[in-house]
């Protein structure tokens, strides 16, 4: 097939078994983590998706807590379609694109992207990974495109490190400034965008000291703990739109 189909379940507590059109698609243990199943070979024009959820399992962490272990599908379920070249969908429910800020201070910031890319086609293909960085106001700061190729069936990690961003606006709880990094896979021959992921990032750094306590962006910062359970009336742990 020229398209791939994936079922993403953001959370089902505590264990889930999934069937598509009566055939086993996969299972997952853990009520607080997302998971993705490749259902490409199971999908047809009209589909029946059956998800059986069990919250009675006592061998799945957390084994004990002072709150109620609710059961059921309590976060969104998605059917995702991709081309044969796409970001890796088999990395523990993630997007396959990981963004960090190895340099973050009031003078300069650097963005690093590590993207896992998969080629599900039966032949080698030449691609480009394109990254665009926008500031909090939506202004394009940097753009970059680096070529690479993948063999048939290969998954590889492609890395990118930005040029220095001068005087970045730092993130704080009082002023949570966020930049945006858009990462795309592009067909090197046709220029077609095959897959694209957008991530928000904040430039900040922190440290701990036995005498000075916690510091954010080089300044002492008081931490305030909040004892709030993932539980609310009348929906329990469910998250609405």
Locate the predicted segments by residue.
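Hydrophobic/tyrosine-rich beta-strand signature of extracellular beta-sandwich/beta-rich modules
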Residues: 51, 131, 181-183
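Beta-strand-rich interaction surfaces with strong enrichment in secreted/lumenal proteins
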Residues: 24-27, 37-41, 101-102, 144-150, ...
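Short strand-edge motifs at loop-to-beta-strand transitions and within beta-strands
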Residues: 33-37, 154-160
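Active-site-adjacent substrate/metal-binding segments within catalytic domains
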Residues: 1-8, 13-20, 26-27, 62, ...
